[in-house]
Amino acid sequence: MTLDRDAASHVAEVLSEALPYIRRFVGKTLVIKYGGNAMESEELKTGFARDIVLMKAVGINPVVVHGGGPQIGDLLKRLSIESHFIDGMRVTDAATMDVVEMVLGGQVNKDIVNLINRHGGSAIGLTGKDAELIRAKKLTVSRQTPEMTQPEIIDIGHVGEVVSVNTDLLNMLVKGDFIPVIAPIGVGANGESYNINADLVAGKVAEALKAEKLMLLTNIAGLMDKQGQVLTGLTTEQVNELIADGTIYGGMLPKIKCALEAVQGGVNSSHIIDGRVPNAVLLEIFTDSGVGTLITNRKPR
């Protein structure tokens, strides 16, 4: 076999660059929200699974929280159940909640678990109802126009917010060398199911576990300034300034606020990562430049 010296040299450089990061993060917990394009492309799905298995193999503890909005929408359409959204949130009546549980807790969750396990991992699929992993309550949404004397309370059904996270279960799995894969379904005080935004679940899980990092995979290159340039590193103070001056707006606001709250809640750093890039998770963790935006309380890269 002929040795390709250029290829071998590149591999050596990559490993050399990664080694300090591996040492730094060994034994640490990283919570990764998996969604967007990274869940749709077969190549990206395979790369993600391999990334997760490699992280576990070098002593890092990944915890995966996944979305599944498009898959839910597809099944609702096939069942002729109409979808309605208010402020970006799916109105979830009882019939829709049944579909959400079926898709997230069944199809999507088990597909991810199976993919990770096929590449050598030991993943276990969970919903928030397992051992009351995610206790939740109904999310209250209000709207007020200048003509209203009081805000209007809008009922969006079985949409919830996180009350608490059962860290005992997750810590037991992590210490047992398992990789938890969590569907964002919460359980209420009376056993009712709640559909919860996956970013919010990932953020609350990261806070509860005192994770080293929260990583949110997206379909964009990262946070951008008004000139369209990616901002690779920001403090929480700088992010708040960008929100105030309108640089960050619209659909990115909930995701950014989730990342901010995680850092303010004790997570060392949050990352908005371009999930369209192959091996994005490894590149963000193990390279100097990364592939997205890092948010932290201290001066970042």
Swiss-Prot record:
GO biological process annotation, one example: arginine biosynthetic process via ornithine
Domain of life according to the entry: Bacteria
EC identifiers of the protein: 2.7.2.8
Marked site positions, Transition state stabilizer: K33, K255
UniProt pathway annotation: Amino-acid biosynthesis; L-arginine biosynthesis; N(2)-acetyl-L-ornithine from L-glutamate: step 2/4
Compartments reported by the entry: Cytoplasm
Main location: cytoplasm
Alphabetic keyword roster: Amino-acid biosynthesis, Arginine biosynthesis, ATP-binding, Cytoplasm, Kinase, Nucleotide-binding, Transferase
GO MF terms, alphabetically ordered: acetylglutamate kinase activity; ATP binding
Group of enzyme by EC: transferase
InterPro entries: AceGlu_kinase-like_sf (IPR036393), AcgluKinase_fam (IPR004662), ArgB (IPR037528), Asp/Glu/Uridylate_kinase (IPR001048), Glu/AcGlu_kinase (IPR001057), NAGK-C (IPR041727)
Reaction(s) catalysed by this chain's protein: N-acetyl-L-glutamate + ATP = N-acetyl-L-glutamyl 5-phosphate + ADP
Positions that bind substrate: G68, G69, R90, N195
One cellular component term from this protein's GO annotations in UniProt: cytoplasm
Entry similarity comment: Belongs to the acetylglutamate kinase family. ArgB subfamily.
NCBIfam families xrefs: argB
PANTHER family hit by this protein: N-ACETYLGLUTAMATE SYNTHASE, N-ACETYLGLUTAMATE SYNTHASE, MITOCHONDRIAL
Function: Catalyzes the ATP-dependent phosphorylation of N-acetyl-L-glutamate.
Protein name: Acetylglutamate kinase
Source organism of this protein record: Pseudomonas putida (strain W619)
